[in-house]
């Protein structure tokens, strides 16, 4: 349903039918076609006098003509599709008009063909838009077209037949009629019962048909009202677009949310109306229930008078398994609720709304059938009461005839049983409708509450924007709070990002190292300043006063709201982009901090191990000495030779020794104090930093950093070479303009009687010729340099692929969990993969730019060579040039000649091109050519560049 509404809202059909003048699409196409035809005729009328013109016409003008033919064919196909669409619509409209107004239609005289077949022999389809005819019009049927052989009247045919022929015809008609009757095999009484049953069924279906017809007419009127409103609004839109020259359209997310909200509100209104009608039907059913109870009591009274009381068969009415139905409905609702609790996407939301619309439509049909069933129950109950009243009136006459009385009581009992079954069916249908109403209302509420949580399928940024879309309603407060909600969400996102970053730092830090705490806090304050600035900027922004901005008109309000909402979305995207940049900088800073923290942790852990080992040695030497003298001598020996042992330059370690058997020995030791504390300073350990073994992660990081450095240098050289293309193009354009001026002057001088005009023009054209030759040399050097850049780019891509394969291999060995230094964690591997993918994408972009630059330079070189060849023909210097270049061509096997001076030192473009070239010295060639420097800087083995 939503897809159908969207296709109707954004169709070219509006542009071609609503406007009074021709559509802009058709005007644009016609104007474009006229311009192309004029240009193509101009191309065709040109004459190819010279070989160069013929080559230009074949290689450049011929593809243009081919493109024009293709575009003309596409335009013709588009017009043909529109014509096909219009012709089908017109044919169906003609059929509808012929059906509604046959007196205005001229019937063609056809041959003896079947009236139900078209001209091609296929059966004629009924008119499509018969339901579009307004109600209240008595539509006559289309009269049959008379055959050629049946133009004679009936009286003329009867007059030519005799009485024998008439009798024969009558008897044959009766025989055919009797043979056509199908035998059912029922008796007369059974046939009467079957006829009565079928007639009642027909009556019930006709009643239901009337209800469906009334609901259809109401829906039909509402449909055309909406169609007229849409047409008027579209006319206004088109007029405004024509007036202001605008072509703006609604954003897809806004249109999607508006359509979904409108569909849900329509479903909610329809359900409310159906529930009101259902309440009326329930009240009528309760009234009929009381009447059925009264009829049952009257029937029991009659039966007890004439017969003995038997087991009450009427109470054994067949009932449906209500418990099973309740269980099925509850399970279906639970499954729908579980599905709705999942994250909704746009496609799922559209599917759920379509299901809801189909459910509401089926509820309308079921409610109409329930109302018709209640009316049928009322008529059946009326008939039952009439039969009971008749039986009560005739009971005096039927007392004598017991058989007839018993038959009538049996018939009345069957009728009462049927009425009770019908009432039970009404009750079951009512319960089913109530359950369906509950499920539909819950579904509407769930979908209305989850429109804000809908996520896009492909675009993550679109998901965040779509979550902010409110449910469209008539209240202005929800619209007024739209911008404040978006700004609060932006602030929350900034704060959440900052808190998550603080949490990551807190997990990486250890409470044993105070210096690392200070370092991380300093870094967090440094990296969090930009996010805080963003928050303060958002806080400083003042929200506009929407009450003053909104005018009185509803359309103007919608426009203002749409503009403000668009600005809010734009600000949101800008803030999100800034947050992404801040996060990227923070990640880079955190990576460096993580490396430093890891080094500090390793150093501290190593020193802790050494301290513990030295403590154990001290404890064992103090406790395990067998004799005091040996212990004292040993202690004195150790103190004499190793007075201090230090692990780090600032670490002091004190040991308190208070055993009772060492007090005297300590007193006898010279140079000792009487204190029981002995401060030992360890200084035997080497203070030089340990050589750190690089891990696989460090190796990969080093390779990636090396590639990044090479990328910087490569980008510098690549940008320089790309900028040279513009310089070459400008120079060639200037030279071409000067040549055109010289040609104009030469034509003017040829018209004058002077004879020295050719020599003057030739002397002025020779510097331009030499300059063009130098540019051709420079272009050849640029092409060779670009080949070197291309090879280097392929080698860089191959190195990136090798690094990526190494990361994948190490990650596959570890299984995503880092166990040792020879493995990489899954998170770090993902970061490396992301960096490599970014570099690959940069390489692809560079490759594309390089290919486009090569094409431009080749085209420029071809143009320069064409100008040079023409100048050589005009100046008559081709022979000298060929004589001078013959040995070089034979030695270089057809390759273009590059002067040695230009190859070694490069060519410097001249500023004043019209002046004669001065004698060059060797000092002007000191600066080396950038092309040669780029050519010899890198030589990598080429890899395979991706397509």
From Swiss-Prot:
Domain NAB: from-to ranges: 10-90
Keyword annotations from UniProtKB, A to Z: Cell membrane, Coiled coil, Membrane
Protein name stated in the entry: Protein NETWORKED 2A
Record field: compositional bias (Acidic residues): 109-118
Stretch forming the signal peptide: none
UniProt GO MF annotations: actin filament binding
Coiled-coil features, chain-numbered ranges: 348-454, 568-619, 722-809
Superkingdom, natural source: Eukaryota
Pfam family, one: KIP1
PANTHER family: PROTEIN NETWORKED 2A (PTHR31631:SF18), PROTEIN NETWORKED 2D (PTHR31631)
Organism field: Arabidopsis thaliana (Mouse-ear cress)
Positions of the UniProt region annotated as Disordered: 105-131, 618-675, 743-763, 911-947
Compartments where located: Cell membrane
Tissue localization of expression: Expressed specifically in pollen.
Domain remarks: The NAB domain, also called NAB (NET actin-binding) domain, is sufficient for F-actin binding.
Lineage, uppermost ranks: Eukaryota, Viridiplantae, Streptophyta, Embryophyta, Tracheophyta
Any one of the GO CC terms: plasma membrane
Compositional bias (Basic and acidic residues): 618-627, 635-644, 662-675
InterPro entries: NAB, NET2A-D/KIP1-like_C, NET2A-D/KIP1-like_dom
UniProt record similarity statement: Belongs to the NET family.
Keyword tRNA processing: no
Polar residues bias locations: 645-660, 749-761, 915-927
Protein function: Plant-specific actin binding protein. Associates with F-actin at the plasma membrane in growing pollen tubes. May be part of a membrane-cytoskeletal adapter complex.
């Amino acid at each position: 349903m939503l897809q159908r509404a969207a296709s109707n809202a954004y169709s070219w059909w509006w542009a071609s039918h609503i406007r009074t003048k021709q559509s802009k699409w058709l005007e644009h196409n016609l104007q474009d076609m006229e311009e192309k035809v004029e240009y193509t005729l101009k191309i065709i009328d040109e004459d190819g006098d010279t070989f160069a013109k013929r080559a230009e016409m074949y290689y450049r003008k011929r593809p243009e003509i081919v493109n024009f033919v293709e575009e003309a064919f596409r335009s013709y196909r588009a017009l043909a599709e529109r014509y096909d669409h219009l012709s089908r619509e017109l044919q169906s409209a003609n059929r509808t008009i012929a059906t509604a107004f046959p007196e205005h239609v001229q019937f063609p005289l056809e041959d003896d063909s079947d009236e139900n077949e078209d001209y091609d022999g296929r059966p004629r389809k009924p008119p499509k838009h018969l339901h579009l005819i307004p109600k209240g019009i008595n539509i006559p049927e289309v009269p049959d077209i008379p055959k050629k052989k049946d133009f004679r009247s009936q009286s003329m045919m009867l007059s030519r037949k005799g009485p024998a022929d008439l009798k024969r015809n009558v008897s044959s008609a009766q025989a055919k009629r009797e043979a056509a009757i199908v035998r059912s095999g029922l008796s007369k009484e059974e046939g009467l019962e079957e006829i009565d049953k079928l007639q009642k069924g027909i009556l019930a279906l006709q009643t239901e048909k009337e209800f469906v017809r009334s609901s259809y007419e109401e829906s039909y009127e509402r449909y055309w009202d909406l169609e007229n409103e849409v047409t008027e609004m579209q006319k206004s839109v088109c007029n405004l677009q024509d007036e202001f020259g605008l072509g703006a359209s609604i954003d897809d997310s806004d249109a999607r949310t508006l359509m979904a909200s409108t569909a849900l509100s329509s479903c909610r209104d329809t359900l409310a109306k159906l529930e009101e009608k259902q309440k009326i039907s329930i009240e009528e059913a309760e009234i009929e229930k009381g009447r059925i109870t009264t009829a049952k009591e009257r029937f029991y009274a009659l039966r007890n008078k004439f017969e003995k009381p038997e087991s009450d068969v009427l109470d054994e009415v067949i009932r449906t398994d209500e418990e099973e139905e309740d269980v099925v409905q509850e399970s279906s609702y639970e499954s729908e609720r579980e599905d709705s609790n999942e994250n909704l996407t746009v496609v799922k939301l559209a599917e759920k709304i379509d299901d809801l619309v189909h459910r509401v439509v089926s509820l309308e049909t079921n409610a109409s059938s329930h109302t018709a069933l209640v009316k049928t129950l009322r008529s059946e109950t009326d008939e039952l009461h009439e039969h009971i009243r008749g039986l009560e009136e005739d009971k005096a006459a039927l007392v004598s005839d017991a058989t007839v009385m018993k038959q009538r009581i049996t018939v009345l009992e069957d009728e009462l049983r049927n009425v009770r079954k019908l009432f039970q069916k009404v009750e079951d249908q009512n319960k089913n409708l109530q359950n369906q109403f509950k499920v539909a209302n819950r579904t509407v509420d769930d979908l209305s509450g989850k429109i804000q949580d809908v996520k896009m399928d492909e675009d993550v940024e679109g998901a965040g924007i779509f979550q902010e879309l409110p449910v469209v309603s008539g209240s202005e407060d929800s619209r007024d709070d739209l911008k404040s909600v978006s700004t609060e969400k932006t602030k929350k996102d900034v704060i959440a990002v900052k808190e998550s970053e603080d949490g990551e730092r807190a997990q990486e830090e250890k409470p044993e190292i105070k210096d690392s705490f200070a370092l991380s806090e300093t870094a967090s304050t440094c990296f969090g300043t930009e996010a805080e600035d963003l928050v303060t900027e958002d806080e400083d922004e003042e929200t506009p006063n929407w009450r003053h901005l909104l005018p009185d008109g509803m359309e103007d309000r919608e426009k203002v709201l749409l503009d403000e909402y668009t600005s809010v979305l734009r600000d949101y995207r800008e803030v999100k982009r800034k947050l992404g940049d801040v996060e990227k900088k923070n990640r880079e800073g955190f990576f460096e901090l993580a490396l430093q923290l890891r080094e500090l942790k390793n150093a501290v852990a190593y020193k802790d191990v050494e301290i513990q080992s030295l403590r154990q040695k001290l404890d064992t030497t103090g406790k395990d000495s067998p004799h005091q003298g040996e212990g004292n001598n040993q202690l004195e020996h150790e103190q004499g030779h190793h007075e201090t042992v230090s692990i780090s330059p600032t670490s002091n370690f004190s040991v308190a020794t208070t055993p009772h058997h060492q007090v005297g020995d300590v007193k006898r030791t010279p140079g000792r104090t009487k204190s029981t504390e002995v401060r030992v300073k360890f200084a035997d350990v080497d203070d030089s930093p340990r050589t750190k073994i690089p891990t696989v992660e460090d190796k990969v990081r080093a390779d990636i950093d090396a590639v990044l450095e090479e990328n910087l240098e490569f980008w510098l050289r690549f940008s320089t070479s790309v900028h040279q293309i513009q310089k070459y193009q400008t120079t060639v354009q200037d030279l071409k303009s000067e040549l055109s001026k010289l040609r104009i002057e030469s034509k003017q001088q040829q018209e004058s009687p002077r004879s020295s005009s050719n020599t003057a023009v030739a002397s002025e054209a020779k510097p331009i010729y030499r300059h063009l030759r130098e540019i051709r040399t420079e272009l050849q050097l640029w092409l060779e340099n670009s080949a070197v850049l291309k090879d280097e780019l392929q080698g860089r891509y191959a190195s990136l692929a090798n690094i990526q394969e190494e990361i994948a291999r190490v990650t596959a060995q570890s299984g995503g969990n880092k166990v040792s230094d020879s493995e990489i964690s899954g998170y770090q591997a993902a970061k490396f993969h992301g960096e490599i993918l970014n570099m690959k994408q940069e390489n692809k972009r560079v490759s594309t730019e390089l290919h486009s630059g090569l094409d431009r330079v080749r085209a420029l070189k071809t143009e320069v060579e064409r100008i040079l060849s023409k100048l050589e023909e005009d100046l008559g210097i081709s022979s000298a040039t060929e004589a001078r270049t013959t040995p070089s061509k034979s030695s270089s096997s057809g390759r273009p000649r590059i002067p040695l001076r230009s190859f070694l030192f490069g060519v410097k473009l001249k500023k004043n091109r019209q002046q004669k070239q001065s004698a060059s010295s060797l000092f002007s060639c000191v600066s080396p050519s950038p092309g040669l420097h780029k050519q010899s800087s890198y030589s990598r083995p080429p890899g395979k560049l991706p397509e």
